[in-house]
Amino acid sequence: MHTSSLGPHPGRRTRCAAAITLALLSFHYPAFAQQAAVSDNAGLETINVSGDWLGSGLENSVKTYPGARTVAKKEDIERSGAISIGDLLRRIPGVQASDNSGSAGSAIALNIGVRGLTGRYSPRSTILLDGIPLASAPYGQPQLSFAPLSLNNIESVDVIRGGGAVRYGPQNVGGIINFKTRSIPTGPGISGDAALRYNSYGQGGGNTQYSAFAGGQSDNGFGMAFLYSGQEGSGWRNKSDERVNDFALKMRYEISPTSELYAKLSYYDVLSRTPGGLTVAQYNADPFQNTRQRDNWSGTRKGFDIGYLNTISDSQEFEIRTYFNQASRQSTLVNAAGTSLAHQPRNYETVGIEPRYTQRFALGGTTNDVTVGYRYIRERGDDNAYNEAVATGALSGFTTFQNSTDAHAAYVDDKIAFGKWRVTPGLRFEHIQSTRYDVNNKATFQVANNKPLPSINVAYLLTEQLTLFSNYNTSFGVVQNTQLNTMSASNPLSPELAKTIEGGARWKSAQVSAEATVFHIDFDNQIASIPGTTPSVFRNLGKTRHDGIELVLDYAFDKESILKGWSAYANYTYTRALQKSGANSGKDVPFYSRTTDTVGARFQSGPWGLNLSTTHQGRQFSDEANTVAESADGSTGEIPGFRIWNAQVNWKMPGAKGFDVFAGVNNLTDRRYFTRTTDGNLGKLVGAPRTLYVQGRYAF
């Protein structure tokens, strides 16, 4: 029987992490003068802000960015009490963590839907890690059924819901989400921290999360940082054991005050036992039980990236980076009768290269920042499947498909500044060649796509605090690997196309941060599976329309008032996502809520901090027909809305510099809520019960 390679035992990895951390601590790095900042030009952003919207100069670029954008920094992540990436992202306006896949609740997958778009494995957003696509095959399989990402290694999360299609296409109708790993320290000596957290679920079990970070920079300009994050234990379902190891080694060498080389080596492995869905009768008897104890997902990914950045002058910047990753993932799922196991091992290799150049020049009464860039991605991989008889272990039904994609993208945009206006027209052009070869039947399926994607972003800096913005962007989704072999002369598949318009306002002052955005998305030509076809047949059938409003407010009370130390925050999203084709035209898209909100308050006084928050999502439907009545298997029916409350306290130990403790409760009232999955392990999936956690961290 085929089994996936999961690497060494986690205990040995933990000892390895400690050894590397101690090795780093054994060196002394003298203080290093930080790189001189590029001078500001007539009040405009520096080139490295204009040249890379998701790169340096984050806060300045957010303030005047011409689209809806939210950034969560390290302290925001810690105060949220989030256990997983999904926990964190569901607090961001317009974002819903759907958890409606068969591996929901585990660490292996990411299920994020933006503005009513499907959230199962996050296929409609461009998900990046340090600006590099996170998906193992960004074009051929953008779904994140395997998401090699750990919350403890993340320094910030940048969620751009509109306005970024030119730089980060093509699959971004649901925006761009960039996870930035922790930066290499530039201060004197070695600095870092180690943390240990235990999560205790009111039902099921508990898990331990641990992390280590250490790094520094020498006086010759060479810097290094080691990152490790791990997890062991179980979730809130019976026999939902899980193991995660996430390593990264980052390096940077400052060649001159304006140029640098940077690189990162990474390794990730995960094993998750996934309980799957329950029938209505099983859920009523015990929503936390596991009737599929043989089901599991596993994955391994190794990656390397290297780049060169040169801020040539106040008006020029050049950057080039290349990256490589090798990944494998496997799912094992038992059939309904419990007699057969379906194994699906998949392997991927992806190589990419991205050069970019930005030039600033004056033309008439305007200042222009013109950026030209190119990206080539080469994907190779194979999808395999076979069955194993539970009683005898006999293997049968072997199938193999070999996949290849070569994607070329070129883009140009010009940020034109005149007076208080910032107008950025842009164009991205994609040329994609994809091939899928059926090894068993010796059949080849091919498709070539060429697509121009125009956009325009506009910002008006009304005052120092207030920015008005609007944008129009186009994006598209390519024909994916698993869809290629259903193509024929009578059923030619073409890319999905989306057009997005949004407008809004952003306020930023010492005490108040606020943003209001309205949006409209027309998403046409969606590739949909024809119901009742086995194997699945795909056609260009789907059309949906999404519109809504997103509101965000963060207020810090005056330091001289009676409420000094207090701050309050809130966000609210209303989304209407409707099907516009077929028999269910006019009905809601499945697995999204029309309304979501988060409301909370923070208090900080000396070493003590307190955070109280609540999140809410409205009802959902699990099928296109918006069926309210529940089916016996639990896969179909209304999904009621729910509200949960969370509380956290944090404390910095006096006299023990660098030591702090976080403790809290998620789902304070132990609200019972659920979603559904229509995957092969279909049924009802209970949400997390009341969860207590405590974390200790020592920073040096």
Range-by-range predicted roles:
Residues 132-161:
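Short acidic/polar hinge/loop motifs at secondary-structure boundaries
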Residues 254, 258-262, 266, 298-439, ...:
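Face-selective signature of the C-terminal outer-membrane beta-barrel domain
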Residues 204-232, 236-274, 296-311, 454:
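Transmembrane beta-barrel wall of Gram-negative outer-membrane proteins
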Residues 271-285, 378-389, 433-436, 446, ...:
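Surface-exposed extracellular loop regions of Gram-negative outer-membrane beta-barrel proteins
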Residues 357, 364, 417, 423, ...:
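Gram-negative outer-membrane beta-barrel transporters
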Residues 2-4, 619-625, 651-700:
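C-terminal beta-signal and adjacent terminal beta-strands/loops
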Residues 86, 90-133:
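Extracytoplasmic beta-strand/coil segments of soluble accessory domains associated
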Residues 194, 211-214, 307-311, 317-333, ...:
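Membrane-embedded beta-barrel scaffold of Gram-negative outer-membrane proteins
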